């Protein structure tokens, strides 16, 4: 994968509920998206917050590593880290935020905290060929399950 000095690589981390996800974006193009699902909750009929945060702790390093490998990108190429800051399960968010903040500090790169709901809405403007930037302001309706 060729790189020039103007390339911008962003590592994104999502851990607001029971999925641990990491994506790598280069200049607005999605290079990789890796998710670890937590099947442990199926037996309870819903997400158990404490179990979710424990699984995030177990999954976050392998998920980030897999996303970097799939994108053929090294940590030294990453220019910034984006991470979900909420809303979500507090323990799950804490795992993602702590990991992202520690990594950003270690790499001496910016950390961008992302609102989970805004992320759902704006994710529709990302595709594998780049961004179609929305014209702001705009109105959106987000319907979720409880």
Place the predicted regions along the sequence by residue.
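Conserved small/polar residues in nucleotide/adenosyl-binding loops
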Residues: 146
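Short Gly/Thr/Asp-enriched flexible loops that form oxyanion-binding sites at enzyme active sites
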Residues: 83-107, 126-127
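Conserved phosphate-binding catalytic cores of ATP/NTP-utilizing and phosphoryl-transfer enzymes
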Residues: 2-6, 114-138
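Short glycine- and acidic-rich boundary segments immediately preceding or forming the N-terminal edge
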Residues: 1-3, 105-106
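Catalytic cores of large soluble enzymes that bind and process phosphate-bearing ligands
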Residues: 52-59, 91, 95, 110-113
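Nucleotide and nucleotide-moiety/phosphate-recognizing core
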Residues: 71-77, 99-116, 123-125
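Structural motif
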Residues: 8-11, 79-80, 110-112, 137-141
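N-terminal beta-alpha supersecondary unit
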Residues: 6-87, 120
């Amino acid at each position: 994968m060729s790189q020039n000095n103007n390339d911008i690589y962003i590592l994104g981390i999502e851990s607001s509920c029971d999925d641990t996800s990491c994506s790598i974006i280069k200049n607005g193009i999605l290079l990789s998206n890796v998710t670890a699902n937590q099947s442990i909750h199926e037996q309870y009929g819903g997400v158990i917050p404490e179990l979710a945060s424990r699984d995030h702790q177990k999954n976050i390093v392998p998920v980030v590593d897999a996303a970097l490998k799939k994108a053929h990108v090294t940590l030294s190429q990453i220019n910034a880290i984006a991470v979900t800051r909420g809303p979500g399960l507090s323990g799950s968010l804490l795992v993602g935020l702590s990991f992202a903040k520690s990594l950003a500090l270690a790499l001496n790169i910016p950390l961008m905290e992302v609102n989970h709901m805004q992320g759902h809405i704006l994710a529709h403007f990302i595709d594998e060929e780049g961004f179609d930037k929305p014209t702001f302001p705009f109105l959106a309706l987000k319907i979720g399950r409880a």
